[in-house]
Design a protein with these regions (language model features):
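Hydrophobic structural segments
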Residues: 1-218
Length: 218
């Protein structure tokens, strides 16, 4: 059986963690080690007391997350932060985190996998950040409402729901982009217009983005 360090090294190489830029002080890789060989792996978006407890209850001793414990440099071990670390250590659960390396990977990345889950075929990158693309884009020819329905069905399988800006009757999606997480800002909106996109699927967007999107043909 592999140790958490061995599995982390494999994941780091696969996701190209060392070469992939990320937000300042984001810590990608093995954040908390353990003692025993890894026998079961759990995965979640966030490292929270709930997801840690879920991993423990499932008998996992490696938790893989997108949003790890450490973001802003030095952090004191107090409050909820201490509770999370204590639970990992007391139950010998290792923690591995991959942020932008997991968003940006062209095969295993969040954006690429979500696009394929929705029946879309990525043909290039979108949402440029330094030397990488956090999202994907491509072409299609389908009713926008059918894409929203597919998004909603996917979201509901995971306890959520899809929210769409105003859609005119008969509107079709021909040039799309998928960027997971908080993928909409002034830069990505401008990039979408420059690329001639008509539809963007994202994890979350601010209120103003729905207003701007309608005025920009998105």
């Amino acid at each position: 059986m592999n140790t958490a360090r061995e599995l982390a090294q494999l994941a780091n190489e696969l996701l190209r963690c060392r070469e992939t830029p990320d937000y300042p002080l984001a810590l990608n890789g093995l954040q908390v080690d353990n003692r025993a060989p890894v026998t079961r792996i759990a995965a979640a978006v966030d490292c929270s007391q709930r997801t840690i407890r879920g991993a423990i209850d499932a008998g996992a001793n490696l938790l893989v997350v997108h949003h790890g414990l450490f973001w802003g440099g030095l952090q004191s071990l107090t409050g909820a932060h201490l509770d999370r670390v204590r639970a990992l250590l007391e139950h010998d659960v290792a923690l591995y985190s991959a942020h932008l390396p997991l968003d940006a990977h062209e095969t295993f990345g969040n954006s690429a996998l979500l696009a394929r889950e929705l029946g879309l075929t990525p043909a290039g990158g979108f949402a440029r950040y330094q030397t990488i693309f956090c999202g994907v884009q491509g072409t299609a020819d389908l009713e926008t409402t059918s894409l929203v329905t597919a998004c909603d069905a996917f979201a509901r399988r995971h306890g959520g729901q899809a929210i769409a800006s105003a859609i005119d009757p008969g509107r079709r999606t021909r040039r799309w982009a998928v960027v997971t997480g908080a993928g909409i800002n002034s830069d990505t909106m401008r990039e979408a217009v420059d690329c001639g996109l008509d539809t963007i699927v994202t994890g979350e967007g601010p209120h103003w983005s729905a207003v701007d999107a309608a005025e920009k043909g998105l």
